[in-house]
Every structure is written in structure tokens, then in C-alpha cells.
């Protein structure tokens, strides 16, 4: 028997080669292919950072089994018996170990949360954002598979069986091996090239026989159904179109994610959304980071209100003791207003903490993490100087101690109180310097404020309301700037005189009887407190007038035209509509007759000359396969369904276009409303400041000779109402600005002009216009 091992060795080597090729199909190779596809997509890196809280501590190819629920574990063991997987243990960590290294901490270990830090932490730790990147990764994997499917693919297989006849002692082991390639080419032609061989081994005596070999090539070319690259490459085409759409969706989600972090509203649908995208309507409610800093400022405003109420209560009590208030009801009303203010302050702080905990969860952080919200973003809205609030609070405490009849105040105590007041000189001078800076900012803003007033006067809707030429006059701004400058100069002089009087009085306390010293010190401290209240109101006025906002001009039709060129979801909507049409084209092709030409050729060898092919052992076949469309009811129904699906997509696309136009019409109306409300709210704060100032002056008026020295019956109520009106107007002013700023951000998103930095932060374009130069 002739033994020929050549063909056997070749086939074994080829089989091992193909097997090694398959072993190279590992996750690392998949990662590399995805990176080649998506390397230029902004913000796309599906691999978690080492300092992410989402990072698996056991970052291995096969995850560690987590700890199971005990009752669920019993079910697994009962059914799977000894083959059940081993349960995890309680010590297994599911959270990344180094995530705290990413936290921007101060020296006390408290996270400092400004806008940039909030965005950075969200991109690191948010499972929502990570999910979107992983969905895009999976979409890229679909493309790698479709490309692999159309490439020439190797295949190899081996089968073996033992054969023994009952009456024979010989045992034969027969093995068959086959290897080759298969692929698609041309106009949908499929081809298969293979090599097969047979091997027989007699186990009883060790004889080896290599059987005949067969080389085969088969080509099948469709002539009707499926006879086009357009058809057989459809799956790859759709996979790559979907990948492009999803890459756009990730970028748009990144923009929407910024809006979510900042305003609490994400209009983006995200990756792997099927069909025509929806257009979410704009919501004027604001949460997120802007909502947090709005709450912080509301708390500051409430603290300033409580400080002013305390100061007013002290002055009213002094007036009551001096006989200038005949009814204690007014003092009690002021005290009740103070209690209400303090209660509101506690409620505001509790609400803020609850909102902050929820925001931590959104960022992917634990709710018990200590966080301090930094609010430089709304620095201009700190109408009340916190230093002055602190000084006023200290002065009120000193006045209470001086006037307390139950307190045993001696001369040394009064001298110490006086020195404490004089120790505030530097802080007072610093606040005066701050007032000058605020006035400088107001002066710098005057030209833009005047232009803004002119635009408001020219609006037709305001003219219809009677707010034309007599409203928003530039002369009022000039007068306001002049008055504030004069007030600042007067206050600087009065404060200097008051501090000089206090200094002399404190130095001469030792020569004055204790009761007289208490009265004089209380009077001077009370006078200083009144000056500080006026200084606080003046600074609030100056800062109020220096606040500005970006311009927004929206023409709905022009904005729609800009969005049609730049909006990523609009690009996807057009592509999705074409995808629906392409489905009808594919379904129509399925209705055609199956007519294929089959060409097949074999080249073989006999069992003796295995591996030595002979032309005499060859064979060539040509055939036609025909399958008529007599029973293609399922294909017919699919085609009809695809036609209906296209019409539905067409209507959805039209609805998408109309919804975009509707959103811009809303933006146009809202922007005008915000612009008007911004100035009206500013005027309301201005009026409230004037009311507080007037009520303060009335309280400090000296008695007129020959007239009733008592205050009016509503003096206390007027002062309390004025302070509460100032609080409400200040909060409303901030709320309008926050809403307007959130709308500006959203408008750039809706236009398709939003640009983010590498850190995911919005690049403010300044004025937001509906007509944008196209790139």
C-alpha cells in the first residue's frame, strides 16, 4: 500500500493556520477595528478612565462573579447541582478604586463644584454618558462584521468516525478533512473554493490509507433577484449609514448632555435611535447646575433679607423704647416677619441640600459626598455684599447686648464693644472700594444699555402696549448713574465722619456714666448700622444696573433654514427617510424571479495518487436554477408593509420639519418676552430698593419741633413689606436671567451651531442670531 503524507501534512498545516486566524478574533482586535472606524469622533472613548467610579476593579476579559442573592443562589444550585458556577463573596468591589483621585477637593476634603468641574465629573462618572459611547461602539461592531462577511472567508472542518463489523476484528478510523474559501464578488455572485481529502487508519494493525482528494470551485451568479451590488452589499451599506447616524447622535447627545448638566434638560435622544428623531419642545424650567446656583443665590438673598429684618427690628425696638412708636403691634409685626424669614431660610437650605444630593447622583457621585457649589457664574447677581451682611449681623448682636436690661454690662464691656466696631473699619473701606468698582462697571455698560433701550422702544409689540417713546429712555440711565455717583460720594463722607465720632466716643467712655455711655454707644452703633444698610442698598443698585446679557435675535424661517443645514438630527432624519425608501427597493427585489447560473468545477485524484490531481479526474458543470414567484405571498406582504412604512416615515419627516419651525417660533416669542421681563424685573428691583431706602429714611427721621414725634401706624409694616418686595424682586430678576441664559444655550443647540470645547464646555458665541454663515 502506498502511503502519501504530503497532502495530509498540507491540510493539517492549513487547518492549524485557519484555527490560529480564528483565535486572533479577540476583543483587542475588535477594539482596534473600532478605533480605525471612529478615531475622529469627538468625545468618543468607550474605555473608562482609571479614575472613573464606573471602572471595574477586576478589569479582566471574564468578569468576576458578584455576590448573589441567597435565595436566588439556592434556585441555581437546586437546578444545576454540582455544575453551578461558584458564588462570589461579599468582599468583591464593584466600584472603581481610584475614583476619588478625580475629585477637585479643597484643603478640607470638600468637592469644589463649579461649571467646569461639574462637566468634568459627569463625563467621568455618568453611566448615562458611558452608555451612549458603548452603544456607538456596538454600532461600529456591526460594520466590522458586515465587512468581514463580504471579504473572502476561510473555512475548515474535520470529521472522524470509528467503524467495526461484528464478525470482523478490524477497527477502521475514517477521517475527512475539508478547507477552503468562500466569498461574494461582482454583481452578487457567490463563490466557494474548497479542498477535501479522506484518511483511513486501521487501528488493529496500524495501516494508514490516504484516500482520494477533491478540489472544487462553485460560482453562483444571480440574473434577476439579488443580481446587483446594491442588493448584496445592502447590509454593509445600512450598517455604515447607521454608524454615521449614530456618530452624529453621539455628538448631539454630547451637546444635549452639556445642557442636561447645566440646565437639567437634555433634548437629544442619543445613540441607536430608530426612525425619524423627535423634536422635544423647549421647557422654561431650569434645574441642573444653573438651578443649583440659583438656589444658592436665593439663599444669599434670604440671608440678606433676614439680616435687614433683624436690623429693622432693632431700630423699631429702639424707637418703641424712645416713645416714637406708640403701639407695640408694629414691633411684633416686624418680629413675626423676622421669624417667617428665618423659617423660609431654613426651608430654602433644606430644599437646596435635597436638590444637591439628586445632582450628585446625576453626576455619578455618591449622595453623601461633601460638595460646595461655587457660583462665579452668577457673580454679578450678588446684589448684596456678604461682607456688609456679616457686619450688620455683628452690629445687631452688639446692639442687643448693649440694650439688654438683664445683661450686666460694665464699662470695660462697652469699651470692648466699641473696639469691635472700630475693628470693622478696613472691611467698611473695602466695601466702599467695591462700590466704586461696581459704579465703574455700570458706567462701562451705559453705551450698550442705551442701545438696548433703543431696541426695546422700537419693538412693535411694546408700542401696542403703550410702552413706546416714554419707556426705556436713555436719560433715565444717565440720571441713575449720576445719582449713584453722588450717593457714593456722600456715603463715603458720612461714613468717615461717623467712624471719627465713634472713635472719639469710645476713647472717652471712661469719663461718662455707664447708662449714658450705653445710650450713646447704642445710638452711634445704630446710626452706623443705618449707614451700612444704605451702603448695602447703594451697592445693590450699582450692581443691578451693571448686569447684562447676550443678545438673541430669532426669525423662525431663517432659523429653520440654518438648522436644515447644520442640525445633526436633521441630517439623520433625511438619511432615515431614504433608508425607509431603500427598504421598499429591497422588498421589491424580493418579488423578482430567482434565476441563477451555477458554474461548478472539480479536479480530483484517485486513492492511490492522493494529492496528485489529474485532468482525467476533473469535471465541469454548468446549470440554471429557476424559482418562479408563484407563492411569494410573504414577500408581497413585506413589500406592501415597506410601502406603508415609507409613507409613515415621510409623514414623520414632515412633522419633524414642522416641529423644528414650531420650536423656533417659540424661541422667537420667548426671547422677546425674556428681554422685556429682564428690564422690567430690573426696574422692579430698583423700585424695591427705593422703597426700602424710603422706609429706612422714615424710620431715621428726627422728630419735628411742635409735631407728634411718633411714627405712623404703618411704618413697621411698610418697612417689612419693602424688604420682602426686595427679596421677591431680586429672586425674580435672577430667575429671568437664568431662564434667558438657558434659552440662549438651547437655541444654539436647536440651530445646530452649538460648539463644545474638548472638556465639553459650551463656547459662548455672544449674540445668538438665526442667520449663521454656513461653513
What are these regions (language model features)?
Residues 17-20:
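C-terminal motif of bacterial Sec signal peptides marking the signal peptidase cleavage site
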Residues 58-121, 125, 551-556:
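Regulatory alphaC helix of protein kinase catalytic domains
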Residues 22-24, 28-69, 354-524, 542, ...:
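Acidic, low-complexity, intrinsically disordered peripheral segments
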Residues 140, 154-157, 161, 173-179, ...:
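Hydrophobic, small-residue-rich alpha-helical packing segments that form membrane-like cores
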Residues 101-111, 158-221, 376-392, 457-468, ...:
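Small/polar, glycine/serine/threonine/aspartate-rich low-complexity segments that form flexible
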Residues 132, 136-143, 239-242, 253, ...:
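Amphipathic alpha-helical coiled-coil segments
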Residues 124-130, 137-152, 167, 180-209, ...:
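A glycine-/polar-enriched beta->alpha junction
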Residues 153, 161-165, 198-200, 253, ...:
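Structural signature of outer-membrane beta-barrel domains
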Amino acid at each position: 500500500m502506498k502511503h502519501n503524507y504530503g497532502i495530509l501534512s498540507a491540510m493539517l498545516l492549513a487547518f492549524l493556520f485557519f484555527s490560529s486566524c480564528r483565535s486572533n478574533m479577540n476583543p483587542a482586535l475588535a477594539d482596534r477595528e473600532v478605533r480605525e472606524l471612529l478615531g475622529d469622533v469627538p468625545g468618543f472613548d468607550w474605555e473608562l478612565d482609571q479614575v472613573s467610579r464606573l471602572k471595574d476593579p477586576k478589569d479582566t476579559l471574564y468578569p468576576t462573579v458578584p455576590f448573589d442573592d441567597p435565595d436566588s443562589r439556592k434556585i441555581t444550585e437546586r437546578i444545576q447541582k454540582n455544575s453551578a458556577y461558584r458564588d462570589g463573596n461579599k468582599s468583591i468591589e464593584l466600584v472603581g478604586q481610584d475614583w476619588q483621585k478625580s475629585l477637585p477637593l479643597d484643603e478640607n476634603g470638600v468637592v469644589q463644584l463649579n461649571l467646569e468641574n461639574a462637566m468634568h465629573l459627569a463625563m467621568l462618572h455618568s453611566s448615562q454618558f458611558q452608555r451612549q459611547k458603548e452603544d456607538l461602539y456596538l454600532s461600529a461592531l456591526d460594520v466590522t462584521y458586515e465587512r468581514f462577511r463580504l471579504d473572502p472567508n476561510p473555512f475548515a472542518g474535520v470529521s472522524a468516525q470509528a467503524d467495526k463489523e461484528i464478525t470482523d476484528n478490524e477497527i477502521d478510523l475514517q477521517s475527512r478533512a475539508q478547507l477552503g474559501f468562500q466569498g461574494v464578488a461582482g454583481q452578487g455572485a457567490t463563490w466557494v473554493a474548497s479542498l477535501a481529502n479522506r484518511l483511513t487508519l486501521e487501528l488493529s494493525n496500524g495501516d494508514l490509507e490516504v484516500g482520494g482528494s477533491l478540489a472544487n470551485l462553485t460560482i453562483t451568479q444571480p440574473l434577476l433577484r439579488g443580481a446587483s451590488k446594491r442588493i448584496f452589499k445592502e447590509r454593509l451599506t445600512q450598517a455604515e449609514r447607521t454608524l454615521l447616524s449614530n456618530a452624529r447622535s453621539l455628538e448631539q447627545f454630547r451637546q444635549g448632555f452639556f445642557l442636561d448638566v447645566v440646565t437639567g434638560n437634555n433634548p437629544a435622544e442619543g445613540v441607536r435611535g430608530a426612525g425619524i428623531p423627535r423634536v422635544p419642545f423647549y421647557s422654561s424650567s431650569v434645574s441642573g447646575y444653573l438651578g443649583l446656583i440659583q438656589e444658592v443665590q436665593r439663599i444669599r438673598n434670604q440671608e440678606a433679607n433676614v439680616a435687614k429684618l433683624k436690623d429693622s427690628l432693632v431700630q423699631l425696638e429702639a424707637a418703641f423704647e424712645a416713645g416714637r412708636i406708640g403701639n407695640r403691634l408694629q414691633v411684633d409685626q416686624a418680629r413675626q416677619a423676622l421669624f417667617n424669614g428665618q423659617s423660609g431660610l431654613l426651608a430654602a437650605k433644606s430644599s437646596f441640600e435635597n436638590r444637591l444630593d439628586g445632582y450628585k447622583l446625576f453626576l455619578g457621585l455618591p449622595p453623601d459626598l461633601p460638595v460646595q457649589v461655587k457660583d462665579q457664574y452668577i457673580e454679578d447677581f450678588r446684589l448684596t455684599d456678604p461682607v456688609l451682611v456679616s457686619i450688620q449681623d455683628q452690629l445687631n448682636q452688639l446692639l442687643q447686648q448693649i440694650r439688654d436690661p438683664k445683661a450686666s454690662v460694665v464699662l470695660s464691656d462697652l469699651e470692648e464693644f466699641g473696639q469691635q466696631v472700630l475693628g470693622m473699619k478696613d472691611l467698611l473701606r473695602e466695601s466702599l472700594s467695591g462700590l466704586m468698582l461696581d459704579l465703574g462697571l455700570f458706567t462701562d455698560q451705559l453705551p450698550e444699555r442705551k442701545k438696548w433701550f433703543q431696541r426695546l422702544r422700537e419693538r412693535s409689540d411694546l408700542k401696542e402696549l403703550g410702552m413706546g417713546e416714554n419707556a426705556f429712555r436713555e436719560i433715565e440711565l444717565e440720571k441713575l448713574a449720576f445719582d449713584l455717583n453722588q450717593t457714593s460720594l456722600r456715603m463715603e463722607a458720612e461714613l468717615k465722619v461717623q467712624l471719627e465720632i465713634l472713635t472719639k466716643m469710645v476713647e472717652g467712655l471712661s469719663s461718662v456714666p455707664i447708662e449714658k455711655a450705653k445710650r450713646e454707644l447704642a445710638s452711634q452703633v445704630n446710626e452706623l448700622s443705618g449707614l451700612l444698610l444704605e451702603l448695602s442698598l447703594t451697592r445693590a443698585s450699582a450692581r443691578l444696573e451693571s448686569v447684562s446679557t447676550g443678545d438673541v435675535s430669532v426669525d423662525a424661517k431663517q432659523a429653520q433654514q440654518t438648522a436644515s443645514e447644520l442640525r445633526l438630527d436633521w441630517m439623520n432624519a433625511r438619511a432615515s427617510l431614504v433608508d425607509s425608501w431603500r427598504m421598499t427597493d429591497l422588498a421589491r427585489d424580493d418579488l423578482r424571479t430567482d434565476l441563477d447560473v451555477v458554474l461548478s468545477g472539480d479536479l480530483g485524484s484517485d486513492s492511490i495518487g492522493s494529492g496528485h490531481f489529474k485532468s482525467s479526474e476533473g469535471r465541469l458543470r454548468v446549470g440554471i436554477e429557476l424559482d418562479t414567484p408563484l407563492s411569494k405571498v410573504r414577500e408581497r406582504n413585506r413589500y406592501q408593509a415597506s410601502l406603508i412604512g415609507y409613507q409613515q416615515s415621510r409623514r414623520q419627516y414632515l412633522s419633524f420639519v414642522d416641529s423644528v419651525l414650531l420650536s423656533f417660533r417659540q424661541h422667537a416669542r420667548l426671547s422677546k418676552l425674556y428681554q422685556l421681563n429682564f428690564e422690567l424685573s430690573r426696574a422692579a428691583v430698583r423700585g424695591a430698593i427705593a422703597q426700602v431706602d424710603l422706609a429706612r429714611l422714615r424710620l431715621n427721621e428726627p422728630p419735628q419741633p411742635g409735631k407728634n414725634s411718633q411714627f405712623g401706624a404703618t411704618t413697621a409694616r411698610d418697612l417689612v413689606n419693602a424688604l420682602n418686595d426686595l427679596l421677591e424682586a431680586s429672586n425674580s430678576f435672577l430667575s429671568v436671567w437664568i431662564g434667558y441664559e438657558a434659552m440662549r444655550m438651547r437655541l444654539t443647540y436647536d440651530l445646530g451651531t452649538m460648539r463644545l470645547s474638548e472638556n465639553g464646555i459650551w463656547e459662548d458665541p455672544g449674540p445668538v442670531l438665526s442667520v449663521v454663515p454656513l461653513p
